[in-house]
Amino acid sequence: MERSAVRPYRLLQRRKKDVPIVAQSTETTDWVSRFADEVIEESERRAPGKPVVVASGLSPSGPIHLGNLREVMTPHLVADEVRRRGHRVRHLISWDDYDRYRKVPADVPGVDKTWSEHIGKPLTSVPAPKGSAHPNWAEHFKAAMVESLAELGVEFDGISQTAQYTSGVYREQILHAMKHRGDIDAILGQYRTKKAPAKKQQQKPVDEAELEAAEGSGAAGEDDGSSGAAGYFPYKPYCGNCEKDFTTVTSYDDDSTELTYACTECGFSETVRLNEFNRGKLVWKVDWPMRWAYEGVIFEPSGVDHSSPGSSFQVGGQIVGIFGGEQPIGPMYAFVGISGMAKMSSSKGGVPTPGDALKIMEPQLLRWLYARRRPNQSFKIAFDQEIQRLYDEWDRLDAKVDDGSALPGDVAAHSRAVGTADGELPRTPRPLPYRTLASVADITGGHTDQALRILSDLDPSNPLGSLDEARPRYDKAEAWINNHVPADQRTIVRAEPDAELLKSLDEQGQRSLRLLLDGLAANWSLDGLTHLVYGVPKVQAGFSADATPKELPPEIKTAQRSFFALLYHLLVGRDTGPRLPTLLLAVGQDRVRALLGE
């Protein structure tokens, strides 16, 4: 179905009668628009009148992490832009669930070392972790990703490679590859003897995460195919006895399609007819280009491990011609990091997934992080204090878009973040500052009535009717506080006044508290308390509370820091804590007065 969409960064242009109005790009474009231009043009050249096909590939070999999400978000954003312009488009996600189980990921609940017995089997033949509701390993990890993609508004057609191979969908392609195995071997041979180019001086050395990612991808050398005494074969059977792929093809007859293989794991051997045998797959460097041709893929990005010289994307660009297809437009995408952690690799457990991120941030923010950076730019997703700064940046952008002051590229990224061609994603009705919500959740410790009271005090002229108005953002901030803030950084309000500290205060310290206490009632709102706590040191120094930094000597900043530290010590027994206006609101006026010695 053709769709039209109106977006702030687009111009609508009426075409001739009976032609739908579609969204047209403005001259100022972002990376998504530029790829969409290229993809539409290429699709019309290759397959005029047919839906544009973009693709992603995900291997459910373990938790599917936030780096893998870039494999999906890059084509999703391009597909969505194509759809906004009124074109039909399919976003395929190939679940590589017929891949071999390579290793047991660490730190996966319900999994122990006994899972190593299944190494070499298809992922769909490996048991799911203990306690899982899913029938096998692949379905267990696929399910979590499907749920996250739904929350992110990603529309796709999923293809199980287990289903494709075991039902014989690719039979003709397999027979064709076997018939042309000499041509495939010759292409692969061009790269087997080449050494990787020396890394440039300014490049960082490959870290363990990158090596792990390469090992878990089609860049691994073993995905080249076997070349034993009987020659090269681009096809690998799974053993009929142990189900593993420790097999070697020992003979093949093109006319009869009789194939004999032996398993080095269990010693089993058999002869089958490949024109009716469905328990095996093409090796990765042949499988991928075969699928490009079979599905007519126009756009599919790949990670740096697939894009290096001699790796699967480069080699596939030559092999795809054997299947009568063309290589897709395929930008390389960079690694995605986590604040405070090394680059991610899904062959390790314990690495944050999209589901983990969506517990602490709204889908709009996560979409924005992927939309605002070109695929070849690396970026980090924050699970530490940095998330508060990211949310501040997002809220500022939101305000600029609303008042028309945002730059066109930023407007485009914002539009892609808040919705798709099908409409806007559900959003928080009253998006209060994330850092404020986090502080309130921290201090109230799950008491929703107390949280509502404090949040209503933020703006007494427009109080919250219920906590639902601040959801789901409030729930995300609460989850971040509860799961990602170390215990020693949590805020615990003092139960009793610090009598010793209060007694030790000099006249200036006592006067600062008096000025604050005298102004509490009249300034009991977020803005009012902000003005008050910054104003007390100004007034003490003989300036107006409204004086700007330019009108003040540098020592006022020092006095403010000392005053803030005093308040933190009296309220929470530490040098620092949540922003003071939020903390004061959270503690409540009566308790603040008691803790400050009134």
Model-predicted regions and their roles:
Residues 62-69, 124-135, 160-162, 166, ...:
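The substrate-binding groove and active-site-proximal loops of carbohydrate-active enzymes
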Residues 6-10, 154-354:
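Active-site cores that bind ATP or allylic diphosphates and position pyrophosphate for catalysis
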Residues 308, 313, 323, 334-486, ...:
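Catalytic adenosine-cofactor/nucleotide-binding cores of aminoacyl-tRNA synthetases and other
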Residues 20-109, 289-308:
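N-terminal catalytic cores of NTP/NDP-binding nucleotidyl/phosphoryl-transfer enzymes
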Residues 98-116, 173-174, 342-349:
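Charged, often glycine-rich, active-site loop that binds/positions anionic groups
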Residues 2-51, 63-64, 90-92, 202-203, ...:
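Basic, alpha-helical terminal appendages of large translation-related enzymes
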Residues 113-134, 148, 152:
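A glycine-rich helix N-cap at a beta->alpha junction
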Residues 85-87, 144-157:
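A structural motif corresponding to the C-terminal end of an alpha-helix
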